[in-house]
Amino acid sequence: MDKESKPQRLYVLQARNRNHPLTCREQIKNAFKDLREVPVGIDLREQSIIGVVSGGNREGAIDVLRLLAVQIAYNNCYTDVKLAAVYDEKKEVEASSLEPLKWFPHCWSTDKKTRYIAGSKDEAREVFFDLSQCLRDRFNSDKDNVSFSTHYVLMLTDKEYLEGELIKSYVDSKKNVGLHTIIVADSVTDLPNEV
């Protein structure tokens, strides 16, 4: 073992009554009840809206959003997942974290005419319009539980960007249209009711 590697922890569980299987099960459950510094998996197919609560640390929440985008792009082909990000370009933390996503091929429309990155409300309208065009046929389809070849992940640094926009009806819809929305909020009460 080299000097810099840390030894692994070994948990030894002592069963009071070795004949009773619930004793060991409860000890295992209690030993691993709280896990710290481990990756958390999110199945976007199961969740249409996800909230990232900053709890006063907005920079940390934006960083989580950026890391999610990078991991989604790294693990999925740009033809399978399209990423869209809407942020406030006037806020340095948001702009420095999310603006570089524009270089990902995942952030382009399939016809390569629209980049799904917006730093202002006007740019957001263009992104929302293009996404709405893509999702309209899916929404109007009579089929339920359809698996889509392309999924769209919409990342918002504020839920207010959705107000008055057509895409809000797709975000709020219970119908699966292949749209997954991740919203950053300062507290749980700032998230939409659907989260």
Language-model features, listed with the residues they occupy:
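Accessory regions of macromolecular translocation/handling assemblies
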Residues: 1-195
